[in-house]
Amino acid sequence: MISVLIPTYDYNTLPLVTELHQQLSVADIAFEIIVQDDASPLNSNTDNNQKINLLSDCRFERNDTNLGRGQNRNALIQKAQFDWVLLMDCDMFPKSKGFIQNYIHQIQNSNHSVYFGGLQY
């Protein structure tokens, strides 16, 4: 159903992924969450992000070389296995517990190609 793609660089994305994973699990749909670090230095953020691999249908990957923002996003899109893609910045967080459900509702009940909103920095 949906691939959630999160490019990152030297940022702890575990809290975001944990929240999204919980919401996606409640929605009871097929999903994957992929976080891709763009070759940032190895540190505590990398250690925290490795824990993403412990969540079902989630994975953390790290580029060997820095691709830059655009190429990192494009690389993530190439890895997506579902037709619907939700691109999120690593420093965003859903404003509500219904964030994912709102997106799923729109996907299933309208014919638009692009949706945005419901986030805060």
Model-derived features with residue positions:
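Acidic donor-binding segment of Leloir-type glycosyltransferases
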Residues: 20-61
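Short aromatic/hydrophobic "clamp" motif used to bind/position activated sugar donors
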Residues: 85
